[in-house]
């Protein structure tokens, strides 16, 4: 029939039973259940090296996980399944790292996955207390905006998205982006059929490992109403060439659980991009608010530059970027007319980094009724004393906040 679904095979040792409430649904056998019929469930296909007795399930041909391949906290296969032989062993992951490390102006990263309906953030291997306070506050502020736009919760992987309570996940892309580049990276798990069906999911790992019959029935009925029943193939008898009588059927996983059904795809993409644009809009943005020359007489001019970061994020984007020395300070370069002389100040000046509006995110009292203001760390003023006349230019460069220019005229025209 052109589909790879599931096989259910009647077996007194089986772990599953047919639901009494809907014959399509398989439910787990209870510890004290002795009344069959019981079933085993397999992915549709043939058994490898079948000898008439053992029914060995073939290993997945897709054992490599690109999201366990990144250099941050990478671990070998015996410790982290899917990690591959060494970090960045695959051309795809190497290409991503080469792209990002060669572009110093990246201020944020979004990575799209399916499925689950949750927005994830670093770290995977550390609690929030290990993250610099400002970075954590920014992550929470951006995450809250994500919750508003996407309608899904934002969760720390370490605290809320672990497959095993005794293990952490290694070699993850968004961890690498944050720890190596100092950029705030999120992983969006797109689409949740459970949410569409009105099922409340609080534990995003446990729910998919083991959920109630009530929840499964609710999801099954949702696809009956909204997909015309096309998301599930009813079980039918089939003679398997190796083991004989089986039944074929089950969920069409690709466009029910794993991805949105086609008619829901556009809405899902629109939400995802809306948050991506909001995330991008939070980046730092340099602005020259004033650049002028004041004539002091005797061929002297006082040159003044007022510079500001009008973005939400600081020009360094994160504290970790500073700690790991992966971002250069903002640089101001003055361009003087021929024969002009600089008496006070430097032609090239490093001004450090400018805070963004996010500086308030770390304040203890951020409610406006109690807020008492902050220092003007979002702004810088530079002054020079110049002897000479003509056009004076200024260029302000930041790896992550852009480049801005202006000019003024010294002396009478």
Where are these regions (language model features)?
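Acidic, glycine-anchored loop motifs typical of Ca2+
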Residues: 1-7, 12-18, 23-25, 52-54
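Metallocarboxypeptidase
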Residues: 27, 37-38, 43-296, 302, ...
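A generic membrane alpha-helix/interface feature
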Residues: 19, 129-131, 327
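General N-terminal targeting signals
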Residues: 21, 83, 163, 202-205, ...
